């Protein structure tokens, strides 16, 4: 299974520094920089991948892509039927780590890998490395 997740924030999201949060404004819905690169359009159009949005609620910080994963959700079905799950993205110490924690509620650790060359962390990778070692996740 190929699953893409995107932050898709309203312009007044609570995580933004201008609204009292800790992050600069980023991934504002329908703006440049919020979407997937054009190179991914083909796999999405093929039906072999699924796109899920997160961070859409103005007053809720959401690091994990699957925080509120209900067993009857599309996300749960995709994850539970996956032969393997490779995780990558930004930021390794926040969203990638939290999303992987969410995935591990559904998928056994031996089926989960972190694509470390495709991850960037704010802390240089220390928190994610510790998490990978603690959970016994494979690095690719």
Residue ranges, per PLM feature:
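Conserved phosphoryl-transfer catalytic core
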Residues: 1-5
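Active-site-adjacent betaalpha module
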Residues: 10-18, 24-140
């Amino acid at each position: 299974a190929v699953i893409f997740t995107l932050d898709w924030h309203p312009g007044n999201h609570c995580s933004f520094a201008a609204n009292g949060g800790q992050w600069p404004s980023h991934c504002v819905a329908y703006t440049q920089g919020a979407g997937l690169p054009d190179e991914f359009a083909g796999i999405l159009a093929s039906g072999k991948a699924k796109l899920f949005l997160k961070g859409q609620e103005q007053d809720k910080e959401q690091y994990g892509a699957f925080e509120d994963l209900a067993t009857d959700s599309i996300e749960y079905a995709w994850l539970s039927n996956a032969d393997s799950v490779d995780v990558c993205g930004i930021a390794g110490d926040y969203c990638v780590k939290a999303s992987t924690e969410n995935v591990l509620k559904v998928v056994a650790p031996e089926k989960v890998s972190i694509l470390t060359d495709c991850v960037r962390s704010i802390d240089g990778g220390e928190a994610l490395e510790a998490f990978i070692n603690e959970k016994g996740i494979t690095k690719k």
